[in-house]
């Protein structure tokens, strides 16, 4: 479904990022669904029809990968220049001096920028796993997307799975373990 979470729409609002929000999120009435009955719910707008071209790779993604590499090799200034370029194209302000000077703050800024720029393009899960981030972020969609915050969610929305380190990686196949005794099974299997 790729439904935008309330947290994502708030992140756009906090940045004053109407350009990317309007390109990614739409509040449209959906009369055919029991769970999304009105225009109070956010829907993905980035690819609005089944004939919309789907980009496999965008320049912004490549630039943000470069910024991430710079941030992880202690060049926060170089990473900030790239992020500021992308933020400028979206019509929002530059990063703070503190973010530009700190490798840790720059890594957070790059991850945040990837979230806003590449929203609903299939990168978020990989970003969170790469950074070993808080797994609860994966379940923000269960928080619902009713902008008024007044909906009561039934069991359809309440289904949750326990997320922990054991569920991030799949088990190594038994045949691989038997063929190479130097390979160890992933935790939890």
Enumerate the language-model features and the residues they cover:
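Acidic/polar-rich alpha-helix caps and helix-coil junctions
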Residues: 15-189
